[in-house]
Amino acid sequence: MEGPRSDVGRWGRSPWQPPTTPSPEPEPEPEPDRRSRSRRGGGRSFWARCCGCCSCGNRGDDDWGPEPSGSRSRGTSSRGRDSRGGRRPESRGSGVNAAGDGTIREGMLVVTGVDLLCSRSDQNRREHHTDEFEYDELIVRRGQPFHMILFLNREYESSDRIALELLIGSNPEVGKGTHVIIPVGKGGSGGWKAQVTKNNGHNLNLRVHTSPNAIIGKFQFTVRTRSEAGEFQLPFDPRNEIYILFNPWCPEDIVYVDHEDWRQEYVLNESGRIYYGTEAQIGERTWNYGQFDHGVLDACLYILDRRGMPYGGRGDPVSVSRVVSAMVNSLDDNGVLIGNWTGDYSRGTNPSAWVGSVEILLSYLRTGYSVPYGQCWVFAGVTTTVLRCLGFATRTVTNFNSAHDTDTSLTMDIYFDENMKPLEHLNHDSVWNFHVWNDCWMKRPDLPSGFDGWQVVDATPQETSSGIFCCGPCSVESVKNGLVYMKYDTPFIFAEVNSDKVYWQRQDDGSFKIVYVEEKAIGTLIVTKAIHSNNREDITHIYKHPEGSEAERRAVEKAAAHGSKPNVYATRDSAEDVAMQVEAQDAVMGQDLAVSVVLTNRGSSRRTVKLHLYLCVTYYTGVSGPTFKEAKKEVTLAPGASDSVTMPVAYKEYKPHLVDQGAMLLNVSGHVKESGQVLAKQHTFRLRTPDLSLTLLGAAVVGQECGVQIVFKNPLPVTLTNVVFRLEGSGLQRPKVLNVGDIGGNETVTLRQTFVPVRPGPRQLIASLDSPQLSQVHGVIQVDVAPASGGSGFSDAGGDSRSGENIPMAYRGGA
């Protein structure tokens, strides 16, 4: 088991406060000038490394024939034209470049250009499932071949030698996989090879195979040739850079997924649902992952750079996912998002106001500063974007009644005084109403067999792991079976989903005694978006055995035996005959409500129960405020009878105390006079917020302006001030912020906006509203975008990205 985690992070009792001004790290060192790099590895040493079996240099230069005297030369050629002067479509390359005196000798094999077939409609992008990326460069997935065309100054001959080069990082080395040499027509090392598929005189069609273990990232690309007349090297051209990603379609890749519908959902879907609230009152919001938006891929790679992750480790999905979990939060390393659970978001954006990841990631890429602010669903949404973009099958997961174990006991310990009133100064463990993290799919070669598949990655900074704020990847299978000694961070994740809630009461002598153990209170429902639908999928069964089953109890006790309180189960008391259930009325914010406690006597004797009810507001992280209403009542139950106690709560009573998410916590404790049985229950519930209503105004066509109408009714009798709308949708609208001023109490407003779709197909346009008085207001509409006239699938026009406009309302009305 790993060492204990630190007591700093994402709950209210922490002394940590978000920094007023995030401080960026120094930017990464600039890479050496491309021209100096183009000379690296030239001449005899380069060709010696073109061994057909490996890069060991066992083949000497003589294998390529004697080097002609004075053969190293430099020359030029018109970009985009073949040797006959005709226009060469889609050609890339800006001339020629060879070491030496700059002379192009007669008979030298000169590469005048390269076509990487990298447009979105070309074969490479379609076959590699990268055609949705809003990039002009070639983007391929490792372990899968791609095609290119070399344009030559003369016909290719059997005696000619051609080698492709891929380089990444500031100091590329063959032994570290950062300098890849691929001899054309010969087998390379580690699965790299290039074959001629068609020789059309001056054009050479190649099929290039990449290694399924290749480093991911953006590679520089060049071509070298050697002939009897001399050597030549194509100069580096930024337009010829190649992105290589993980490949869930490749059986040899560690991230391989053997279900096409999973790949479509968990790799290619650009939007999804994130669930929040409480188990009894589940809320859902649509999130724009936007992994294919222009700039997002560069932002994802920048994250690895900012962490200083060695390039040699970027081919390992376990290492990459762990770095991502550390870098999506800002603690330790000035990562992407600043966490804030204080309720004061005046120096940034309320976490509830975000509608997607694109604005966050592009801001981080553009400025290098951590973005304020995030909470668990924002960290998870951004993590899904980053991992899907890099090629992981990833989903966003919500765990309701998620425990936060601060002392590695693997139990949730709650302390009460003699009258069963919570002792908040002792209650360091907390139960979050919900917590959102990620599952990503991969093999685990670093673990024994049986732990492949879904792995938990959690970027929310709760506790440290190996000294940094990260969590995972952790095998879900190890969590299910209580194998808390498996890396990474299994004890913490196990406690989140399957620990027991232990109630301790202070005795007359000051000691504490266990008076109640609630075995079914933690991890009560674990959900994610279903494949190919907006329905909710219950995945609790993959995290834990059926609640109360022998296998589930074994897993809990096995895990607890490795915790800091291994003997907690030895002190448990006898069975009970009075059952208690808590219910809360489903209410919208601004309305009155009621909470009820139902008692049932399951025994054969009369029972008298003395109840205490304490009501307070609570953050979704389990941090509660002071009690603002309480009630006491004695209930007498005949054998087999039930009775209820109801406590009404008026809007004016809870309004002054409301915090984020509109959640409340009811602490109920009771004592059965006849048997001494102790009753205890904590019940959270939330006030619902309204939705935004979105209506499309006309048909959506690529490259043509389209309108949308947004309608909102203020449910509160008070004015909403400084109201901000956000609008975003991949392929439709770049992130847009709209300042609309104030909205009166119970007022209905209508807002109209336009956007220009840039990609066809079904899309999601997502909006949110935020103000100091009301947040967590969202809306979404599906937009089916038709291709532009003429069949063009994509538009070069970008969505309107103006930000911070003051927008007049199209219509204002009363209640």
Swiss-Prot record:
Pfam families: Transglut_C, Transglut_core, Transglut_N. Tyrosine-phosphorylated. GO terms for molecular function: metal ion binding; protein-glutamine gamma-glutamyltransferase activity. It catalyses: L-glutaminyl-[protein] + L-lysyl-[protein] = [protein]-L-lysyl-N(6)-5-L-glutamyl-[protein] + NH4(+). It is found in: Membrane. It is a lipid-anchor. It comes from Mus musculus. This is Protein-glutamine gamma-glutamyltransferase K. Keywords: Acyltransferase, Calcium, Keratinization, Lipoprotein, Membrane, Metal-binding, Palmitate, Phosphoprotein, Transferase. Residues 1-48, 62-101, 791-815 are annotated as: Disordered. The modification Phosphothreonine is found at T21. Expressed in large amounts in epithelial tissues (lung, liver and kidney). Its EC number is 2.3.2.13. Its cofactor is Ca(2+). It comes from the Eukaryota. The gene is Tgm1. One of its GO terms (cellular component) is adherens junction. InterPro entries: Ig-like_fold (IPR013783), Ig_E-set (IPR014756), Papain-like_cys_pep_sf (IPR038765), Transglutaminase (IPR050779), Transglutaminase-like (IPR002931), Transglutaminase-like_sf (IPR036985), Transglutaminase_animal (IPR023608), Transglutaminase_AS (IPR013808). Interacts with PLAAT4. Belongs to the transglutaminase superfamily. Transglutaminase family. The modification Phosphoserine is found at S23, S71, S83, S91, S94, S803. The active site is at C376, H435, D458. Ca(2+) binds at N498, D500, E547, E552. Residues 66-78 have a biased composition (Low complexity). Coiled coil: none annotated. One of its GO terms (biological process) is positive regulation of cell cycle. Residues 16-25 have a biased composition (Pro residues). Binds 1 Ca(2+) ion per subunit.
